[in-house]
């Protein structure tokens, strides 16, 4: 009898969820501080399965959180720091109104500051979990490193982003773990393999940016604040694993004020010189033979071979970059492949007229050319990394129309449009492309051309031939009809639950096939125009 008269909204979704307004009231925080707290702690809103029940009968649109998440936030010590900061602002405004400069300076010295180290360790209990979340952290920090500082974007935050991203790039260079790269409109995509985890991030193109006014940076700044604390931990662990000093040092070990000088920082973060290693760490040989046993031995052997090719890709090559080339991107890739790179004013003092230079990277016509070096455009370096070998330089010489730059992050499937150049590239990499070539769709305008070639000329005058029965075509027709009927019967057997998914897959397949036909027709037209 007791369960029969149970009160409504005391169980289920009504108890499991809490609206944002209720959460603000429980935590006694403003909306701005609540958002910051949720971003730092990794708490996100959820959509209830029974929204009306969670809203206690109301149909109004509300943002819901798990009640257990809000109870978890209520015990967070950082909330007290938010409240202390509000008190600090109140005192600051009071002293500014009185123009008491000495007290204002003293108040700034005692400004409340919170530390995110404990929260980082709490959100990432293992090092692998932190590496899996590095994609967004690196992309956002690289973006902020390019922005000018404003009232919201503090100078210290932008400097920290530049410092941490350069440190991570130094680690990738020293460990030679860069695997793929791609130049796009958004920026340059990189992919590195760190401790078995593939980390992909995008770096904006090097260009001057004005003050951005149409973006609300208040939320992004909170993300960056957390990612800065996280990257500090990750970089320290990565540097310790391969025996590097942290913070990074060049050549010989330095101490004191020399490390804080702008000239020394410029040398460190230019990526042109190798970092100093600790003497107490044993150097491991990379060329030790591996025991490739098991079902995936072939795939593992191929992976090891590719990694070895990348590490020695530019070994023995000395590159000189012209001033119009993207220095950071090219230096990153060249040094990852074991090459030496320099430019005008580089910290390694490589001169433009040096006899040791083997490759000169230019992006504009040159008046004077040296005989003892190769001149290539910047795309050659990117394509060499993706191809795992040094490509011929004839197609990348200055003033020559560059070949297509394909993305290594896309996997080719049978039935998709695959350009002829991409097939040749895959074939040169030793991959089997027979299935891809066999599944290339035929264009509609090729069929009439074949019919015209086979079609015999009509004889002059009226001629009536004896009718013949074509058994093969009749059998083929009946076979096609039977297959179509069988397919329709199988489609009728699909449950209603999966019919929508099936039709969506069918529509997607048709759309991809039509797109492939259009692209093939366009490529054929461009080729015919170029030949004409």
Curated annotation (Swiss-Prot):
GO cellular component annotations of the record: nucleoplasm; PeBoW complex; preribosome, large subunit precursor
UniProt entry keywords in alphabetical sequence: Nucleus, Ribosome biogenesis, rRNA processing
Domain of life: Eukaryota
Subcellular location(s) of the protein: Nucleus, Nucleolus; Nucleus, Nucleoplasm
GO MF entries: ribonucleoprotein complex binding; RNA binding
A Pfam family assignment: Pescadillo_N
Residues covered by the BRCT domain: 309-398
SUPFAM superfamilies associated with the record: BRCT domain
One BP term from GO: lipid storage
CDD domains listed in its UniProt record: BRCT_pescadillo_like
HAMAP family: Pescadillo
Family: Belongs to the pescadillo family.
PANTHER family: PESCADILLO - RELATED (PTHR12221), PESCADILLO HOMOLOG (PTHR12221:SF6)
Annotated function: Required for maturation of ribosomal RNAs and formation of the large ribosomal subunit.
UniProt name for this protein: Pescadillo homolog
Species the sequence originates in: Caenorhabditis briggsae
Gene: lpd-7
């Amino acid at each position: 009898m007791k369960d029969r008269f149970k009160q409504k909204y005391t169980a289920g979704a009504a108890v499991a969820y809490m609206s944002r307004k209720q959460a603000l009231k429980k935590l006694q925080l403003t909306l701005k501080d609540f958002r910051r707290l949720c971003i730092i702690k990794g708490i996100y809103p959820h959509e209830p399965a029974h929204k009306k029940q969670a809203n206690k009968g109301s149909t109004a649109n509300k943002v819901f959180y798990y009640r257990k998440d809000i109870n978890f936030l209520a015990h967070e010590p950082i909330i007290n720091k938010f409240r202390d900061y509000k008190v600090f602002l109140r005192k600051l405004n009071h002293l500014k109104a009185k123009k008491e400069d000495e007290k204002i300076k003293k108040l700034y010295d005692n400004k409340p500051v919170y530390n995110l180290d404990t929260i980082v360790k709490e959100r990432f209990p293992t090092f692998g979990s932190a590496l899996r979340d590095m994609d967004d952290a690196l992309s956002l920090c690289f973006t902020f490193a390019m922005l000018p500082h404003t009232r919201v974007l503090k100078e210290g935050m932008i400097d920290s982003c530049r410092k941490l991203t350069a440190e991570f790039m130094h680690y990738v260079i020293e460990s030679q773990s860069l695997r793929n790269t791609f130049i796009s409109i958004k920026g340059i995509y990189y992919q590195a393999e760190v401790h078995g985890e593939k980390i992909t991030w995008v770096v904006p193109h090097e260009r001057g940016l004005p003050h951005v006014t149409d973006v609300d940076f208040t939320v992004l700044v909170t993300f960056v604040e957390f990612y800065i604390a996280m990257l500090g931990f990750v970089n320290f662990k990565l540097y310790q694993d391969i025996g590097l000093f942290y913070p990074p040092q060049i050549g010989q070990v330095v101490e004191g004020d020399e490390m804080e000088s702008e000239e020394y920082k410029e040398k460190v973060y230019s990526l042109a010189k190798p970092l100093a290693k600790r003497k107490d760490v044993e150097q491991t040989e990379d060329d030790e033979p591996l025991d490739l046993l098991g079902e995936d031995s072939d795939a593992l052997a191929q992976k090891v071979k590719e990694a070895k090719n990348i590490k020695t890709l530019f070994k023995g090559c000395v590159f000189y970059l012209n001033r119009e080339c993207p220095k950071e991107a090219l230096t990153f890739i060249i040094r990852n492949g074991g090459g030496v790179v320099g430019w005008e004013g580089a910290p390694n003092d490589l001169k433009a007229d040096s006899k040791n230079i083997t490759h000169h990277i230019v992006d504009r016509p040159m008046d004077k050319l040296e005989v003892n070096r190769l001149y290539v455009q910047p795309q050659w370096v990117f394509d060499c990394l993706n191809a795992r070998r040094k490509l011929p330089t004839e197609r990348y010489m200055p003033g020559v129309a560059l070949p297509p730059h394909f993305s290594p992050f896309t996997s080719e499937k049978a039935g998709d449009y695959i350009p002829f150049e991409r097939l040749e590239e895959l074939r040169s990499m030793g991959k089997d492309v027979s299935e891809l070539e066999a599944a290339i769709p035929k264009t509609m305008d090729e069929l009439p051309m074949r019919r015209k070639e086979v079609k015999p000329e009509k004889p002059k005058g009226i001629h009536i031939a004896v009718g013949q029965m074509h058994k093969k075509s009749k059998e083929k027709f009946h076979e096609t009809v039977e297959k179509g009927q069988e397919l329709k019967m199988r489609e009728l057997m699909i449950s209603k639950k999966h019919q929508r998914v099936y039709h969506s897959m069918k529509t997607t397949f048709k759309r991809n096939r039509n797109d492939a036909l259009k692209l093939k027709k366009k490529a054929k037209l461009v080729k015919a125009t170029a030949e004409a």
